[in-house]
């Protein structure tokens, strides 16, 4: 799966891995995985982090090697690519006229009627949080941040 990484990514990830290889034995402590991922700019949830730790430390020794880390990063990038494709497809569903943004009324209707419906107050809070530039529409970047939870914490 590391084959999905570019040579530049492999070099970068190996360098970061080596920074955490304190003993120079080709191993990093599983407990350091969160810090390592954070340095790369990836901030997984606790559940995702636990799953990643299981993936790289299959024998439960408390450490993982660089190859396992590169495989993990390949999987992460593949999932990210797939997620991006899904988000683009979802955005296009709402942006039927290809304006590059979603009208508030359209998004509000969907949030209140599809999937796990929100009430009107929750939908408005979510849209206000997502509309970072305050223009009354949700562009693709705002949509991605909203859908991935990067910009939104539902508070009541």
From Swiss-Prot:
Function: May be involved in the cellular control mechanism of the secretion of toxins from the gland into the venom.
Keywords: Calcium, Cytoplasm, Metal-binding, Repeat
GO molecular function, one term: calcium ion binding
Similarity section: Belongs to the calmodulin family. Calglandulin subfamily.
Subcellular location, principal: cytoplasm
PROSITE patterns hit by this protein: EF_HAND_1, EF_HAND_2
Binding residues for Ca(2+): 131, 133, 135, 137, 142
Location relative to the cell: Cytoplasm
PANTHER family, per the entry: CALMODULIN 2, MYOSIN LIGHT CHAIN 1, 3
EF-hand domain residues: 8-43, 44-79, 82-117, 118-153
This protein's name: Calglandulin
Family annotation (InterPro entries): CALM/Myosin/TropC-like, EF-hand-dom_pair, EF_Hand_1_Ca_BS, EF_hand_dom
Gene Ontology cellular component list: cytoplasm; myosin II complex
Tissue distribution of the protein: Expressed by the venom gland.
Domain of life assignment: Eukaryota
Record CDD domains: EFh
